[in-house]
């Protein structure tokens, strides 16, 4: 890994930029809800005003990327059509319609007469976001950061530098026109700076990587800054003996082909041995007709699959039209397989037996456990979060798709009237611990 990525110490220029964002984030954290909504609307207006320049920059990025032979998948994510840009601009406005995540009272409690405790949500501070070639992510992430009262340092893929620069220029213009500090949004354009970000623990409070598995793992292992993200998306779907066959086929197909490059697409299908013959009889031609390469264990090969799986396949995130199939004896074997190979992202079961479903969902330790539905629903927008900054597969919160609520933390506010602990020790005062 060391020969691919290095973590250099930040130079003076980067330190200066980071400090400007830090100072701007302090100002933004003190703003009222109405001011942040106003800022988002100004940001959207400036994006509209600069649409022509943004699209021209994207066209230049796209042409350059094509000449360099960048993959079709990356080119697709890089392309910013007028419709996609307009959708992104509308998304910025819609973030302003979401409930304010800041200053929400989670606990209000009288500890004693005249001694009141509150726990309230507060902005995290400065977000460091390293993402792939999608320029629309700049609009989404920046709007979420401002809405939650945070500053943000962005580093996109070099293939989108012109587009990202043009978008950030418009966003900063909008912030400035709204009366907020434009330094709350900062874009880095060099690979060296993106790696040096990992050593900015005095300035950045949370790193959010949105890129390849290799990059995410490297970041998790090489920074002292907390990281919100997931390296792998190895998702499973278990077809139980009591599954509705037509439902199982429909959900399995959607979970794989609706968008195979997504982290919530399934990579392994587990099938109960007693339903396997009937299921595979229909599933094999169905998946074949949708250009899905099926790789299976010996039992599934005996039932018609052409390619036998290796041990490596069970722990591979294909992000492609490839699906591993394993036939299991029962629910217990399915759970054991999932617990061994799952990345704890999203795993599902298809069954008409509610008791079986509940056991599966209670035992499988993933951020999302689904019953009778596609794993592709594991998404912040589909959950009704309005927008998603990333997905976390860690056990501690935030977990799963992370929206605005994952971009705030909390602190305790204790207000008294000269209260001292010694009075309680001497019996002069008593704790009431009464929720208000």
Curated annotation (Swiss-Prot):
- SUPFAM superfamilies in UniProt: ALDH-like
Instruction: Please give the biological process terms from Gene Ontology that the record holds.
Output: L-proline biosynthetic process
**Annotated Gene Ontology cellular component terms:** cytoplasm
Q: Which organism is it from?
A: Prochlorococcus marinus (strain MIT 9301)
Protein name, entry field: Gamma-glutamyl phosphate reductase
Q: NCBIfam families under this entry?
A: PRK00197.1 (NF001221), proA (TIGR00407)
Family recorded in the similarity comment: Belongs to the gamma-glutamyl phosphate reductase family.
Catalytic activity from the UniProt record:
L-glutamate 5-semialdehyde + phosphate + NADP(+) = L-glutamyl 5-phosphate + NADPH + H(+)
PROSITE patterns in alphabetical order: PROA
* Role noted for this protein: Catalyzes the NADPH-dependent reduction of L-glutamate 5-phosphate into L-glutamate 5-semialdehyde and phosphate. The product spontaneously undergoes cyclization to form 1-pyrroline-5-carboxylate.
This protein's source sits in the domain of life called Bacteria
Keyword annotations: Amino-acid biosynthesis, Cytoplasm, NADP, Oxidoreductase, Proline biosynthesis
MF annotations from Gene Ontology: glutamate-5-semialdehyde dehydrogenase activity; NADP binding
Q: Give compartment(s).
A: Cytoplasm
Which EC numbers characterise this protein's activity in its record?
Answer: 1.2.1.41
Metabolic or biological pathway, per its Swiss-Prot or TrEMBL entry = Amino-acid biosynthesis; L-proline biosynthesis; L-glutamate 5-semialdehyde from L-glutamate: step 2/2
């Amino acid at each position: 890994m060391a020969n691919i990525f290095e973590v250099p110490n930040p130079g003076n220029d980067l330190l200066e930029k980071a400090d400007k964002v830090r100072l701007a984030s302090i100002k933004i954290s003190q703003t009222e809800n109405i001011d942040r909504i106003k800022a988002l609307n100004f940001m959207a207006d400036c994006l509209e005003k600069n649409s022509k320049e943004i699209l021209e920059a994207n066209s230049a990025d796209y042409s350059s990327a094509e000449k360099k032979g960048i993959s079709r998948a990356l080119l697709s994510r890089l392309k910013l059509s007028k419709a996609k840009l307009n959708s992104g601009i509308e998304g910025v406005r819609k973030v302003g319609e979401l409930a304010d995540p800041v200053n929400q009272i989670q606990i209000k409690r009288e500890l004693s007469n005249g001694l009141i405790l509150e726990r309230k949500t507060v902005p995290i501070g400065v977000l460091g976001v390293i993402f792939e070639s999608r320029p629309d992510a700049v609009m989404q992430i920046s709007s979420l950061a401002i809405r939650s009262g945070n500053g943000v340092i962005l580093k996109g893929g070099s293939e989108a530098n012109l587009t990202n620069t043009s978008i950030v220029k418009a966003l900063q213009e909008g912030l400035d026109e709204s009366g907020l500090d434009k330094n709350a949004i900062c874009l880095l354009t060099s690979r060296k700076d993106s790696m040096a970000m990992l050593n900015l623990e005095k300035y950045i409070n949370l790193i959010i990587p949105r890129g390849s598995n290799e990059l995410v793992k490297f970041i998790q292992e090489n920074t002292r800054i907390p990281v919100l993200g997931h390296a792998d998306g190895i998702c499973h779907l278990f077809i139980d003996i009591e599954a509705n066959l037509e439902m199982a086929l429909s959900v399995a197909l959607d979970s794989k082909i609706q968008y195979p490059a997504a982290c919530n697409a399934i990579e392994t299908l587990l099938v109960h041995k007693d339903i396997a013959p009937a299921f595979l009889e229909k599933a094999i031609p169905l998946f074949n007709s949708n250009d899905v390469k099926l790789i299976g264990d010996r039992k599934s090969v005996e039932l018609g699959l052409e390619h036998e799986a290796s041990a490596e396949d069970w722990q591979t995130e294909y992000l492609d039209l490839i699906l591993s199939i394993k036939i299991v004896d029962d629910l217990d074997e399915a759970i054991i397989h999932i617990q061994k190979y799952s990345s704890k992202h999203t795993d599902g079961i298809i069954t008409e037996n509610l008791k079986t479903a509940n056991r599966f969902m209670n035992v499988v330790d993933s951020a999302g456990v689904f019953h009778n539905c596609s794993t592709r629903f594991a998404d912040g927008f589909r959950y009704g979060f309005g927008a998603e900054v990333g997905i976390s597969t860690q056990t501690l919160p935030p977990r799963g798709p992370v929206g605005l609520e994952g971009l705030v933390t909390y602190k305790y506010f204790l207000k008294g009237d000269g209260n001292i602990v010694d009075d309680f020790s001497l019996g002069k005062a008593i704790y009431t611990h009464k929720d208000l």
